A protein has these predicted regions:
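Short cytoplasmic-facing helical segments at TM-TM junctions of multi-pass membrane proteins
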Residues: 244-249
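Membrane transport/envelope proteins' first extracytoplasmic loop
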Residues: 1-237, 242
Length: 249
């Protein structure tokens, strides 16, 4: 278990650089103007559009649709292929497993049929939290997916959420500095736009929960092993003591 957990935790940590995971994200009511983007970028950050639309799926769940990402929060293809047509979709692997969906199946959302071409993992949704303040994730009733830009345009645009991801031009050295940078950025950002949500990476459950969970499991198993060793030592000690007494008698 410890070897497997260590390997998974190492792969998880390496994914931050491999998939260029965001330093945070924020959501606004309407799309930012070019002048606003320029002003915000002057605070030593690079902005990336990460717009999404949520729609109900015919199986009773909610799907969050994204365009395929190439720059930040890059997609990890687990099985099959990424969508290339406007009626194709690649969905989160865990969501697919929990809802018994296979590559080649068809999902219906908003009256449109989507052919599942592959299973993916989105690095900013390593755990499927629909809202960051949720007490627990739900990989059954909530899923994430990627579609082509043309496919995205066929969705209900009235439900479009203007979410932006950011990366610091110079990465923080530690979590303490990261918190200070995030607080300063939020303060500056709040003077320029009306924020609907602001989630720095260190507070993002969808990104951090998996790593935190694996780390805590490892610590718990180590403590458990120590307890087992102490118990075994006690039992062996009693057994040896009794054996010596019998032999002496």
């Amino acid at each position: 278990f410890l070897v497997a957990d260590g390997s998974m935790l190492r792969a998880y940590n390496e994914g931050f650089e491999k998939y260029n995971i965001e330093d945070g994200n924020f959501r606004v009511k309407k799309e930012l103007a070019s002048s606003q983007k320029k002003d915000i970028s002057a605070h030593n950050v690079t902005l990336y559009q990460n717009f999404y639309i949520e729609q109900a799926v015919d199986n009773g769940s909610t799907m969050r649709f994204f365009k395929n990402r190439n720059d930040v929060n890059r997609v990890c293809l687990m099985k099959g292929t990424l969508p290339t047509k406007s009626d194709e979709i690649a969905i989160d692997r865990m969501y697919a497993d929990n809802n018994h969906i296979s590559v080649g199946d068809v999902l219906t959302s908003g009256g449109k049929k989507w052919k599942v071409t592959g299973f993916v993992a989105l690095p900013d949704y390593s755990c499927l939290f629909q809202n960051n303040n949720d007490s627990m994730f739900d990989a059954v009733k909530f899923g994430v997916s990627v579609v082509t830009p043309k496919g995205f345009e066929t969705l209900n645009q009235d439900k479009l959420q203007y979410s932006y991801s950011w990366l610091y031009d110079k990465a923080p050295k530690n979590e303490r500095q990261e918190k200070k940078m995030a607080e300063k950025f939020m303060e500056s950002l709040g003077k320029k736009v009306s924020l609907e949500a602001f989630v720095p990476r260190y507070q993002n459950q969808a990104i951090n929960f998996t790593g935190d969970d694996m780390g805590s499991d490892k610590a718990m198993m180590i403590v458990l092993l120590y307890i087992v060793i102490v118990i075994m030592a006690f039992v062996f000690g009693i057994t040896i003591s009794n054996t010596i007494r019998k032999e002496a008698g």
